[in-house]
Amino acid sequence: MPPRSTMIFALAAIVSLAGSSAAQGRGGPQTPLPPGQTNDPFPQPIAGTEGVITVTLREFASLPDINGVAARAMTLVDEPTSRRIFVSDMHGLLYVITPDGDTVSQFLDLRDPKWGVPVQSRGRERGLQSFTLHPQFAQAGAPGFGKFYTYTDVSDQTPAPDFTTPRDTSTHDLVLHEWTTRTPGSTAYDGAAPREMIRWRQPYANHNGGAIAFNSTARPGTADFGLLYVGVGDGGSGGDPLTLAQNLGSAFGKILRIDPLGRNSRSGKYGIPASNPFVSTAEVVPEIFAYGVRNAQRLGWDSRNGAMFMSDIGQNIVEEVSPVTAGANLGWNVWEGSYRFVSQRAVRTDSVRTDPKVTYPIVEWGQIDPLMLPSGQSASVGVVVYRGTAVPQLTGRLLFGDMPSGEMFHVSADDLPKGGQDVIRRVLFLTGAGSTPRTFLDIVKEKTTAQSRAVATRADLRFDMTATGQVFLLNKADGTIRVIER
């Protein structure tokens, strides 16, 4: 494999890098870094052709535009009983889709004033961040019947927040709501206004929450069943200037775990599981499950062994996918991936993965890897462990990706790496008979051109897996939901 410098030069000759911060080390030419520091800790680029898995990508359904703008699809959750698909649009809408993809219905518009949820969706990172269904959503008579949860940036700042930061000023609030529909099988929400559960006062405009999810492997009667995991960003800006991620007295930069049906929290609006790792530790937020998080975009579980994983967006150097266990310190902002964080320009090249108290990534990659150059940006997304058989070439693979470039990657789920990018391999997509393997960004570009939209420059890839093992791909540019097939 040619050295990174050769590959970057070759790609730069065919890819326009105007305006790309990745092209010149994030922000244009800069002074040389001191010895022992680098903005590129990976000597070999991700393999471009070796170990590529090719799958077919089929258009499944389309979401409607909002005022002439494509839906910003963020999260997909299935309801296993009916096999219906729920999908969120970051503008503030939820849709429900029939199992065959033929019928798309608007289930809920959070923006309707009667709900009292003033969705703040300006900018790339704000809006309806995530949602999930309670595992008892379709189980009549169960405590979680009809309940689902939304995680939303809002423009109001009342009532008073449950969690704040030391910063005097703020940009907006982030709110976790519980909704209860009377008829879960309906195509439209028929419940009352939502119940506010938790409110965070956001110090900066970015890193607004992330993923919320229930453990997909937990079964009724097990300790983790019905407990909600909540990814909370480090407050934003850059470099965690308020040092919140390592502060156990703060709820920012964490993965929280709560019982949405309980009431033993300080506010009385939700429960704190007795099994949470810091529940008995003084001066520590008892909701914390893991800490040292920058911007957790997705949470995933392995159905074979229950292992939990997180995709966490890096600063300017390293993207990562990490294992998550109770009480884990995931490193940020002392570490960016396996490397000691220095600044927004650099990490250290010495003392790699040397702190035994830190849980390091299973896999990571450089933001200036040649595969990221078409979008000029990089951000971790995923993560799915595929144990199905319908797409046998993916069986036993852990799937993750890069959000802007649309690259999907795979590694072995049964022989997990210990950091680095050497074993990362690509997943490329066919779109029909006679088609050639392409990246997701290439496919989205083609679609936006056909739709007479502005040609997409980012894929804004998101993907989720249903209980039946179908993997669906989402994006913010063309309103199209796609499913992976053999």
PLM ranges: what are they?
Residues 24-239, 298-301, 306-317, 377-415, ...:
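Acidic, Gly/Ser/Thr-rich repeat motifs that build Ca2+-stabilized beta-propeller blades
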Residues 44-68, 102-122, 178-203, 224, ...:
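Blade-edge beta-strand/turn elements of extracellular beta-propeller
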Residues 96-98, 104, 266-271, 322-323, ...:
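Extended hydrophobic/aromatic segments used for targeting, binding, or gating
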